[in-house]
């Protein structure tokens, strides 16, 4: 800031501007946080009617506030964590984040199920005494993975019992098994005549909150049965 001063002891209507030479105060050099003496510098008298008694003071440099704001992150259930990054504001005097921060990393609350997990300051800190660090957290959001269920095509002969309605599963994560996250079974459109009958999701459902289920149907095809006709042997007299 401008180095200013107060004047006392003027006589006979004199003004400071008339008896002082207009020189400026100076201060001890330095830009880091600390206390720096304010010196008389070039300030002096132009009047022979006074002796100048200068009393110094201090310029105190206090810490600047360095703001670190964590970036919000997302990942799909079962995927690896993204890098936990942040934005920095409040740098002064050409300082860089790399020069004033210790390079420590942010951390997040542990957990791999779908949900929100707080991103915390972790080991991130300052190596510069010129700042106070204000950390603002954010969240890593784990979203649901897509579980694909594709019904197997089936056939049966007219009049036979239905085959088991089976399916293929893809998209499992984190060592999950279909048996641990799915309940219920498929069903098919009613009918026993020859034709094509859609295989539906039925009551097949998820019991895990970590997935969305995408079902793709198929068909049960009833084919014709073979009807055997065997003529009876016959005889007659000539």
PLM feature segments, named:
Residues 1-238:
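Solvent-exposed beta-strand/loop surfaces, strongest in extracytoplasmic domains of secreted
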């Amino acid at each position: 800031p401008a180095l200013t001063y107060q004047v006392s002891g003027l006589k006979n209507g004199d003004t400071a501007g008339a008896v002082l030479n207009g020189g400026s105060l100076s201060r001890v050099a330095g830009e880091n946080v600390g206390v720096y003496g304010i010196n008389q510098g070039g300030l002096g008298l132009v009047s022979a009617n006074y002796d100048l008694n200068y009393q110094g003071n201090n310029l105190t440099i206090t810490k600047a506030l360095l703001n670190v704001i964590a970036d919000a992150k997302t990942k799909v259930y079962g995927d690896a964590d993204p890098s936990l990054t942040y934005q920095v504001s409040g740098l002064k005097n050409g300082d860089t984040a790399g020069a004033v921060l210790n390079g420590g990393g942010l951390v997040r609350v542990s957990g791999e199920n779908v949900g929100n997990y707080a991103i915390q300051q972790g080991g991130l800190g300052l190596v510069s005494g010129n700042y106070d660090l204000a950390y603002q957290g954010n969240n890593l959001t784990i979203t649901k993975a897509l579980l694909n269920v594709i019904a197997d095509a089936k056939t049966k002969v007219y009049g036979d019992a239905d085959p088991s309605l089976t399916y293929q599963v893809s998209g499992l994560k984190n060592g999950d098994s279909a048996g641990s996250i799915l309940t219920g079974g498929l069903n098919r459109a009613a009918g026993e005549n020859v034709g094509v009958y859609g295989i539906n999701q039925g009551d097949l459902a998820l019991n895990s909150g970590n997935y969305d289920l995408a079902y793709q149907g198929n068909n049960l095809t009833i084919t014709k049965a073979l009807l055997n006709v065997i003529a009876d042997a016959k005889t007659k007299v000539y």
